[in-house]
Amino acid sequence: MMEKKKRATPWKPGKVISIRLRNGVYVLAQMVRDPYLVFFNHFNEENNWKGVTLKEEDILFCKAVTRQFLRYSPVAIVKEVTPLLDYALPKEWIYSHIGGHPITVSVKGRERQLAGFGRRCSLVLADKDSGLPEDNPLMGLFQSYIISDIKEQDWDRVGQAELMSIEVFPTLNERLYLCFLYGKNINPEQDISLGKPLPDDYETYIDILTNSPEARRLYLGEHEE
């Protein structure tokens, strides 16, 4: 059982960290511009990263995170890995419009209602390095629309664009565990927001969103005092 940390791991651009996921799996990440973390397709069960070189082609995704995520996640500083230099934040993001409404999803033949998702999603240009007010991830602003209303025919164009949300524990932790299982970037938040069919492996992720007893036992049980 892990003890809840008193404060989040201090932020420093270029700091490489490992995060312990469930079932003893570790993943590598790097702090870039606060509050963005870059996650890499590097997983192991020993938390031993000797010989690992961080490359752009090994990036899973980049996401803004809360201090709550760093506080509740088991984080360790990794000094033996050289940080990826000159990383540029993505410029294409998904904006979820205000006016969230309950949506119904189905996993393993069971329908569940989820709250808090926008009525419409847009692919937008949001240059986080422009120096403009739109850079602030808390404000959710952007420069222009690329696709104002994403439809099924736009899914390929949207690709792996991230939503302009700020991730928390434990939804991000479960997403990373899904990336480990599949060996690639998996994005449940995008799949749910765009109305894509959901695989059975998303069951725990949905459990977290619905605050089910199963999810609380799996994740919060280790962190409650």
How should these model regions be labeled?
Residues M1-A64:
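Short N-terminal edge-element motif at the start of the domain
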Residues K15, T53, H97-G99, G159:
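Short, isolated positions within intrinsically disordered regulatory regions of eukaryotic proteins
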Residues N48, E57, F69, Y95, ...:
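Amphipathic alpha-helical interaction segments
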Residues C62-K128:
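Long, low-complexity intrinsically disordered regions
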Residues V107-E225:
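A eukaryote-biased signal for long
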